[in-house]
């Protein structure tokens, strides 16, 4: 177990000690409980992490397996793998990018840190936990000398407007401040930039199966010279 960050966050009344570290096999049961808390129906329950998937994350790329704790309780997690991303052929599904969530397709010599998921307990979502997890992944992107961090974001309020506007227009409306989306708005505040709306990205009724590919470019990245 490697501790990556220790700091204090404010809950509106008092400061709480936050720890961010890599998760291990002993955390698996608590991580599954966190997923159930964060993604209730109508989110497909078969997409929640299984013991085998979490064990694969730890075995395949432990540096990309993060959890956040307050008072010894896991209240957030984030998982990533390294892939080879080609901007000229950006379309893909979540299942393709993550090997159905197992991350067994992790490419140590790839160019992109790909976010598999991020989750924070609803009781702790105003403490900036998600942003600190994301910042830790940005640091990993720089440390690994990767070109970017990338991942597909849900748009869980799109279903309310799908009869009126396209998914692309919905994203534009959120960016222009005409609408607010809990996931897309959060990712934008974390410094991510949308690059493409992808259909059939993930089975997700609320998002009508759309995903928004959003990246964070590593300004320190230098392409190796021949």
From Swiss-Prot:
Top EC category: transferase
Boundaries of every N-acetyltransferase domain copy: 18-219
InterPro entries in UniProt: Acyl_CoA_acyltransferase, GNAT_dom
Gene Ontology terms, MF aspect: acyltransferase activity, transferring groups other than amino-acyl groups
EC number: 2.3.1.-
Entry-linked Gene3D superfamilies: 3.40.630.30
UniProt cross-references to SUPFAM superfamilies, sorted A to Z: Acyl-CoA N-acyltransferases (Nat) (SSF55729)
Keywords assigned: Acyltransferase, Transferase
Cysteines joined through disulfide linkages: none
Protein family (similarity comment): Belongs to the acetyltransferase family.
Name of the protein in question: Uncharacterized N-acetyltransferase YkwB
Gene name tied to this protein: ykwB
């Amino acid at each position: 177990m490697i501790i990556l960050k220790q700091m204090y966050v404010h809950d509106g009344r008092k400061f709480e000690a936050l720890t961010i570290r890599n998760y291990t096999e002993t955390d698996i049961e608590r991580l599954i409980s966190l997923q159930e808390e964060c993604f209730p129906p109508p989110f497909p329950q078969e997409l929640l992490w299984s013991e085998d998937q979490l064990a694969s994350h730890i075995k395949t790329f432990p540096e990309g397996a993060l959890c956040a704790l307050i008072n010894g309780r896991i209240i957030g997690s984030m998982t990533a793998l390294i892939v080879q991303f080609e901007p000229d052929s950006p379309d893909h599904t979540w299942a393709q990018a993550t090997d159905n969530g197992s991350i067994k397709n992790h490419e140590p010599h790839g160019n992109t840190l790909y976010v598999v998921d991020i989750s924070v307990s609803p009781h702790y979502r105003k403490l900036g936990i998600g942003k600190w997890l994301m910042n830790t992944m940005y640091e990993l992107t720089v440390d690994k000398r990767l070109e970017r961090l990338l991942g597909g974001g849900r748009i869980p309020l799109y279903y309310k407007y799908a009869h009126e506007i396209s998914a692309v227009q919905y994203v534009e409306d959120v960016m222009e401040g005409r609408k607010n989306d809990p996931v897309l708005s959060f990712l934008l505040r974390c410094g991510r930039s949308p690059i493409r709306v992808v259909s059939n990205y993930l089975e997700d009724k609320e998002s009508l199966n759309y995903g928004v590919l959003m990246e964070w470019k590593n300004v320190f990245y230098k392409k190796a010279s021949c």
